[in-house]
Structure formats: structure tokens, C-alpha cells
UniProtKB/Swiss-Prot annotation:
SUPFAM superfamilies named in the record: CheY-like, Methylesterase CheB, C-terminal domain
Reactions performed catalytically: [protein]-L-glutamate 5-O-methyl ester + H2O = L-glutamyl-[protein] + methanol + H(+); L-glutaminyl-[protein] + H2O = L-glutamyl-[protein] + NH4(+)
Post-translational modification: Phosphorylated by CheA. Phosphorylation of the N-terminal regulatory domain activates the methylesterase activity.
Source organism per UniProt: Shewanella oneidensis (strain ATCC 700550 / JCM 31522 / CIP 106686 / LMG 19005 / NCIMB 14063 / MR-1)
Organism lineage: Bacteria, Pseudomonadati, Pseudomonadota, Gammaproteobacteria, Alteromonadales
Protein name: Protein-glutamate methylesterase/protein-glutamine glutaminase 1
Protein function: Involved in chemotaxis. Part of a chemotaxis signal transduction system that modulates chemotaxis in response to various stimuli. Catalyzes the demethylation of specific methylglutamate residues introduced into the chemoreceptors (methyl-accepting chemotaxis proteins or MCP) by CheR. Also mediates the irreversible deamidation of specific glutamine residues to glutamic acid.
Biased composition (Polar residues): 149-167
Ranges for domain Response regulatory: 4-121
């Protein structure tokens, strides 16, 4: 049975365009369209769509308000459309905080190499959300106010890798069973995609300011969004969070977010770690790419790495995690039940690369426990 989709946008042209693309896929069916947030809230209650695509700026009721109301009344997976501007990035992050699960630039052909790829990209994102077995809104972290620090750095998820099917679900480890290995680490890596902004916020806001290791964050995200996302995390977290810049020296208690549209690598000069930011190759599906950062860390840090793969579509991170494991590093994955899309974590869990499958609720405490001896 086709996944039922509600398309919401104040532009009749965009409603028609999105509907045509969605309906080209036999696994998808647009059951209705709405021209503002108020209509979307009512139609969601009346029609029970499985996925909603939502614009942000609309008359009567904007998209962010509509997301909040839908999540309060009849929670449904929502894909936001956003402009590639600073204000658009901020609004999109607000929508994700309100409960939306994923986003695409409104001109989504800008993050694809051709028209066919753009069509496939939208279809896959909608299907990824519609395939969730049970929709449960992710519990938003309760964050005590932290005095924001200025971000010290400067200022796309454009892959069309099919969603990985969970053919052999991996059992999640309860928190009580997760024991610190006693290993000594020098670096924490976290890679993620769909659902990652909320997941990263939930994990990182629980870290103390004196977290003992540098942290590299690889989130599939357009270049226009990563500065705003790093700034937002920096204001919410006790640790420092910045967008990575070429030549940054790694410091304990600082998280470095890979810039959108670029590749982030790490190298060692004696005991000092240093970031290299390089232009992303046109042939690479992911910019930034988890595999590239993980692979560079395997060469620079060997087994002194704890690498975590969080929610995301596709299999980015699997090959880099394989290299890390061969070097002696520890690999963890988010469990299926707490993922927005169980693609990237499943790719490392079902192949035996990950040694633990941990729920998002338990991930921060598990990382802190494992890092304590570092």
C-alpha cells in the first residue's frame, strides 16, 4: 500500500510540482494539498497522512506553528522545505526543534547534480519517513540555560543512497548492561544524517564543560545551514561547539562541526590533532562525508577513538567505521527504535562493526561513562 502524503505550501506551483514528483513513485500517493498551516492541521486530523511536506513561510499559520500543533494533536512525520539563507536555516532548526524530522532546501535541485537525482532525492526522503514502523516524537532535551559563547569558527546531505532495510534487527543494550571498557581515548567521532540535528542536540547538551576529548561532528547538511547549527549548539551546550575551519587545533571539550559542502579530515603532528577542511569532490554523494572523516581518524588516531553512528539515511560511515575497527577503535550505533531513519546505524550494527547498539536516551550517559578513563 502506498505511503499517504499531505503536501503543504502557499505556492500553487510548488504544491503541484511536489505532488507530481511524489506521485511518480508507485510507493507514494499525495492524498491532499494545503495552502497554509491551519489547513494542514485540520487535514492531518481528518485524513491521517503518513508523511507531510511543509513549507515554512505561509499565510494564516506558518509552518513552524503548524508543526507544533500537529505534534501536539496527531504526531506525524514532517519534511520541511526551507530557503538556503541564514534566516531559512534558523527557521528550519526551529521547525526541527518543534518536531519536524527532516528538511530539504526548497530549491532541492540545487543539492543534486541533475533533475533525475533531485526527483529521487525527494522521493527517498519522503519514503524514509513514511517507512517508520511506529512514529513516536523524539523526546526533546530539557536544557538548562547556558550563557552562550561566541562561535569561534567561520560560517549537503545530497545523497541518493537507498535506505538500508533492517533485515536483522540488532538488540539494544540497556544502560545497566553498558560497562566502560577501560580503554583510553583521545578522540570522539559522531556521524549522522536524517534526524541528526535533534539527536546531536540531545546528546551534546548532556556533556559537561570539562569533557576530556575533542569531538568531531559529521552531519549531512547544506553549507548555508552548518554555521547556524554550530552557533545554536554552542549556545545550548556547556562544551564549545564551532564550525570546523582548516587548521583548527583539536582541544578537549570542544566539538568541531564539519562545514556543509566540504570534507573534514583529521591529522596528527606529534600529540597534536589538526583539522583539514577540503573542497568536496563532485563525485562524492555526501558533503560532508562520515566515511572520509572516520577514515582519516583511523590513520591519525588508530584505536584511540570512540566513534558513534546516529540516525541517518543510507550507509555513510560503514566503510570508515570498518577501517576504525580494524585499527582497534570502538564503534557504537544508535538503536533502531530511537532512530528517525535506521539506515546508517543499521549499516554498522548488522555487519558486526558496532559493538553496542544504544538508544538515544542512553547515548550521552554511555559516552560519558566510556570516556571517563580517557
Amino acid at each position: 500500500m502506498a505511503i499517504k502524503v499531505l503536501v503543504v505550501d502557499d505556492s500553487s506551483f510548488f504544491r503541484r510540482r511536489v505532488s507530481e514528483i511524489v506521485n511518480q513513485d508507485p510507493e507514494l500517493e499525495v492524498i491532499a494539498t494545503a495552502s497554509n498551516g491551519a489547513e494542514a492541521v485540520k487535514m492531518t486530523a481528518d485524513l491521517n497522512p503518513q508523511v507531510i511536506t511543509m513549507d515554512i513561510e505561509m499565510p494564516v499559520m506558518d509552518g513552524i506553528t503548524a508543526v507544533r500543533e500537529i505534534m501536539a494533536k496527531c504526531p506525524t512525520p514532517i519534511l520541511m522545505f526551507s530557503s538556503l539563507t541564514h534566516d531559512g536555516a534558523k527557521a528550519t532548526l526551529d521547525a526541527l526543534d518543534a518536531g519536524a524530522l527532516d528538511f530539504l532546501p526548497k530549491r532541492f535541485e540545487d543539492i543534486a547534480t541533475n533533475k533525475d537525482e533531485a526527483i529521487l532525492l525527494l522521493q527517498q526522503r519522503v519514503k524514509a519517513l513514511g517507512r517508520r514502523r511506529i512514529f513516536r516524537p523524539i523526546t526533546r532535551p530539557s536544557v538548562a540555560p547556558v550563557t552562550p559563547r561566541p562561535t569561534t569558527g567561520s560560517a549537503v546531505g545530497n545523497a541518493t543512497t537507498p535506505v538500508q532495510s533492517a533485515s536483522a534487527p540488532v538488540r539494544s543494550s540497556p544502560l545497566s548492561s553498558i560497562r566502560a571498557s577501560g580503554k583510553q581515548y583521545k578522540l570522539l567521532l559522531i556521524g549522522t544524517s536524517t534526524g541528526g540535528p535533534v539527536a546531536l542536540q540531545k546528546v551534546l547538551t548532556q556533556f559537561p564543560a570539562n569533557y576530556p576529548h575533542p569531538i568531531l561532528l559529521i552531519q549531512h547538511m547544506p553549507a548555508a545551514f552548518t554555521p547556524a547549527f554550530a552557533s545554536r549548539l554552542n549556545g545550548l551546550c556547556k562544551i564549545e561547539v564551532k564550525e570546523a575551519a582548516n587548521g583548527d587545533i583539536l582541544r578537549p571539550g570542544c566539538a568541531y562541526l564539519a562545514p556543509g559542502g566540504m570534507q573534514m579530515m583529521v591529522e596528527r603532528a606529534g600529540v597534536t590533532g589538526r583539522i583539514k577542511v577540503l573542497a568536496g569532490s563532485a563525485e562524492m554523494n555526501y558533503k560532508p562525508c562520515v566515511d572520509i572523516t572516520f577514515a582519516s581518524a583511523s590513520k591519525a588516531y588508530g584505536g584511540d577513538v570512540l566513534a558513534v553512528v546516529l540516525t541517518g539515511m543510507g550507509a555513510d560511515g560503514r566503510e570508515g567505521a570498518r577501517m576504525l575497527k580494524a585499527a582497534g577503535a570502538t564503534i557504537w550505533a544508535q538503536d533502531e527504535a530511537s532512530c528517525v531513519v535506521y539506515g546508517m546505524p543499521q549499516a554498522v550494527a548488522s555487519t558486526g562493526i558496532a559493538t553496542q547498539s544504544i538508544s538515544l536516551d542512553n547515548m550521552a550517559e554511555s559516552i560519558l561513562k566510556e570516556s571517563a578513563r580517557g
